Amino acid sequence: MAEFNEHDGRGGRERGRGGRDMRRPNRDEQREERRREAARHTGLMKAAFGRETDEAIENARIYEEGEGRALLWGAEAAAAARVAKAAAEMAEADAEGAQAGNEEACEAAEIAEEAAEAAEEAADPDGAAGAAPTATETTVKVVTSFAPEALYRDATGKTMIVDPGAFTRPGGAYEDGAFGPEQILCSESNLYPILVAHKRDFYDKNRDYRRGSLFTDRALYVPEVLFSRGGDVRRADVLVIAEPVRAFALENHRSERECDKALADRIEAIFRIAAANGTETLIVGAFGCGRNGYPVEQVIELIQNWIAEHPGAVPNVVFAVPRMHADAFREAFGAPEPERPAPVVVAEDEGDREGDDEGWRNVELPEGITLR
């Protein structure tokens, strides 16, 4: 946390020759401090929540590209299941009435049965009863805090947090001292060892799907991640899904149309996965905005349209967004942030970019958060 200068009483900093900050640790020291803290925290989580971590690893689910966007829930899923079941019954009747040895009729019946099973799977992907939300409208809240704080302050019921994670590296260099939304999630939970356990089946396979930094909507759904803050332990599901990086994709000769489709597909996948898994509160950031290159208005419009077309599919949505995007989200959703004590904010350093997965200085800090 940035320190207040007690010498001049104005929140300034002591300066040396050339205006150099004499009190601020340099960048390497900051990163090394975070690296040590990451190692300590990971060891603590393994010791305290070993059994729960193993269960989360076992129960995690990978949604292949396009699978999340095809999920159904509630009345939509029930209707699809009824149609598929009726088709299966008709095909079975036709097969029974066909002559013996009519392989074509038998094959049609088998296909229809498979369709019915697929519809049931889409309706309830993990076999969890009562997964369909019952709300008829979606309530939206906009906050300028990181996702873990939003979990403690603003979430109700079964909660899913969106981790805009690194596509090919578990935790996005968390263990090396990187800093960003994903690393913050890892630093307050047992998420990191879960991600590492899925390196081979999720992250390594993602290397074939980078697509000029647009990536895909291939996602890792982790149920019941444990968050710990001051002895208060909370559970939340975490969806690891990469943000498309429009800025780099255009440099890699991807078209505007490809960039727009990637963002729309990603948001569709996020909300459908949340709804199909019975999420009551979805916590998501300004997905795709900032240095990823998408205008905040474009992101907001896609989310607004989805919510309008599926009211109540996700009963509560909390946007945990940086200050620079907060006004746009509040204006769009009419959701003022609850009043909280005004923090003392110290100006941030300008930093360079270290790459897609570990550029911790890319982070647009929420209100009241500063770096040391």
Each language-model region and where it sits:
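Macrodomain-like recognition of ADP-ribose-binding/processing modules
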Residues: 2-372
